């Protein structure tokens, strides 16, 4: 059975809800999932033992891209997470009225690629409140590529 690690950073609860919805979909299709708050993990060896790693982070800030506060330490140490040759997907919530809509998703995705990860799906960028159909479709896309 393939295994997925879903790590999320959430301030208002939206990104956490998306992480849980993704896990529910993957579980229902036979994938074993582990969902953890980014505040509860460290980077060294994070991806070890997983077939796919999904990283979820909300975006803050208007004039510059700000990752969700708890996600910053993991992002800064992501080179120690073991993402080389690992399948990775990135998702997050934001507000399209800001200059850098879901900018955190973009910078995490870019760094994962620079570290040798293979993007398993196009990033999922949610504007405001999560749309369950959009999340379901993305989770199924991930599942099809693992």
From Swiss-Prot:
<protein>
    <recommendedName>
        <fullName>Flavodoxin</fullName>
    </recommendedName>
</protein>
<keyword id="KW-0285">Flavoprotein</keyword>
<dbReference type="Pfam" id="PF00258">
    <property type="entry name" value="Flavodoxin_1"/>
</dbReference>
<feature type="domain" description="Flavodoxin-like">
    <location>
        <begin position="4"/>
        <end position="143"/>
    </location>
</feature>
<dbReference type="GO" id="GO:0010181">
    <property type="term" value="F:FMN binding"/>
</dbReference>
<dbReference type="GO" id="GO:0009055">
    <property type="term" value="F:electron transfer activity"/>
</dbReference>
<dbReference type="InterPro" id="IPR001226">
    <property type="entry name" value="Flavodoxin_CS"/>
</dbReference>
<keyword id="KW-0249">Electron transport</keyword>
<comment type="function">
    <text>Electron-transfer proteins that function in various electron transport systems in microorganisms. Functionally interchangeable with ferredoxin.</text>
</comment>
<dbReference type="InterPro" id="IPR029039">
    <property type="entry name" value="Flavoprotein-like_sf"/>
</dbReference>
<keyword id="KW-0813">Transport</keyword>
<dbReference type="InterPro" id="IPR001094">
    <property type="entry name" value="Flavdoxin-like"/>
</dbReference>
<comment type="similarity">
    <text>Belongs to the flavodoxin family.</text>
</comment>
<dbReference type="InterPro" id="IPR008254">
    <property type="entry name" value="Flavodoxin/NO_synth"/>
</dbReference>
<dbReference type="InterPro" id="IPR050619">
    <property type="entry name" value="Flavodoxin"/>
</dbReference>
<dbReference type="InterPro" id="IPR010087">
    <property type="entry name" value="Flav_short"/>
</dbReference>
<keyword id="KW-0288">FMN</keyword>
